[in-house]
Amino acid sequence: MNKILKNIINKSSINNVFKTSFNGGISSSSSSSSSYLNNNNNIIKSYNVQQKQQQRYYSSFEDDLSPKKLKEKILENETEEIRDFVRSQRLTKKTASPLEGMNRKERRKMTTKLYRNPDNLIRGGIVSPQPLIPAHIKKPKYVLGEPVIDFEIDDPIEIHTAESIEHMRVVGKMAKEVLEYAGTLVRPGITTDEIDKLVHQNIIDRGAYPSPLGYKGFPKSICTSINEVLCHGIPDDRPLEFGDIVKIDVTLYYNGYHGDTCATFPVGEIDSSSKRLIEATEKALYAAIGEVKDGALFNKIGKKIQLVANKYSLSVTPEFTGHGIGQLFHTAPFVFQCANEFDSVMKEGMIFTIEPVLVESTSPYAEWKMWDDKWTVSSREGGWSAQFEHTILVTKDGYEILTK
């Protein structure tokens, strides 16, 4: 195993780099007790409403472009070892095809596109209080107060039993149906908070629990990431605008198991670049799924995603990964969404997510930043991103998509 990776994987800060939370990784490492279930009243305690109902700060267009400012704003949990690892992935690992990036014409065209009016960049809105959970809904242990245990890259990968697989089929089908419902709500003028509330009720009506709600303090039932926001966007009162694209990530907990899926939806008519971005990302997902089979190396997934990204002159994000899933929301393995040389082997009965995020950028590896809500991750350049995700079962003859 890569020595640098071994060093960083044992640090608690690894949760802030690789995907141990939903949508590809980065999250707050502390779990707020205010997010746990109030057993007496059978509701989730709301965050301090006064604290939450204020404008969240975002600054893609402020003066953090200077090297000095950038250095000062490096995430507190992003250690030098982590940055060294990312550099090693970018510079020293063999890749699916040469990472020459864009040619001069492509780079000039992309640079012109990225330096657009900063007023078009996404600003955080007001986040409403957490929704209530009825007493009869079964909650995951982390909502009841049990700490989340972060997994490590060399942890054993679960081989699911026939009974477990059947549970995963049921919750996977539910997640698929809820995501489809969420997609029907997307239109100009609706807020992501309104979408969250409607989806939340749809999940509750099925007797399921929205896995993100209360996970390490996340305040909502789904993730909604608009335009240049890569992942973990918190639903708020910003209305969707004509021409936006929005990533909706849905995870359900039902009968003790989690099912996870995500898709990118257009808001009204979108431009050709956005259509191309969505098309490329969905192709990357299915190209990667095609590599899944008993005995295959996990690194084939990342290499295939990177091949598609290179073909479309789009960027990948090494820090965001897929993950194992089952009775736990996130578990081994790490499923890297970029070219890598890790040699873990897929085996029949394993279940994990594949969830590429492709980004418009002038570099093969997109730079990102985190908002002060400690969840929302956006492109530093302002390039838009798309994401698609499925939960996959390794079968004797290949794979089964549990969320399709």
From Swiss-Prot:
Residues engaged in binding a divalent metal cation 1: D249, D260, E389
Q: Where does it live in the cell? A: Mitochondrion
In the database record, which residues form the transit peptide?
A: 1-58
Which reactions fall under this protein's catalytic activity? Release of N-terminal amino acids, preferentially methionine, from peptides and arylamides
> What is an example of a Pfam family matching this protein?
Peptidase_M24
| Annotated cofactor note | Binds 2 divalent metal cations per subunit. Has a high-affinity and a low affinity metal-binding site. The true nature of the physiological cofactor is under debate. The enzyme is active with cobalt, zinc, manganese or divalent iron ions. Most likely, methionine aminopeptidases function as mononuclear Fe(2+)-metalloproteases under physiological conditions, and the catalytically relevant metal-binding site has been assigned to the histidine-containing high-affinity site.
Keyword Amino-acid biosynthesis attached: no
The residues the record assigns to binding substrate are: H232, H330
Q: Which GO terms describe its cellular component?
A: cytosol; mitochondrion
Q: Which GO terms describe its molecular function?
A: initiator methionyl aminopeptidase activity; metal ion binding; metalloaminopeptidase activity
Tell me which Gene3D superfamilies the record gives. Answer: Creatinase/methionine aminopeptidase superfamily
- Which InterPro entries does this entry report, sorted A to Z? Creatinase/aminopeptidase-like, Pept_M24, Pept_M24_MAP, Pept_M24A_MAP1
Where are the membrane-spanning stretches?
none
Q: Which family does it belong to?
A: Belongs to the peptidase M24A family. Methionine aminopeptidase type 1 subfamily.
Query: What protein is this chain from?
Result: Methionine aminopeptidase 1D, mitochondrial
| Gene name tied to this protein | metap1d
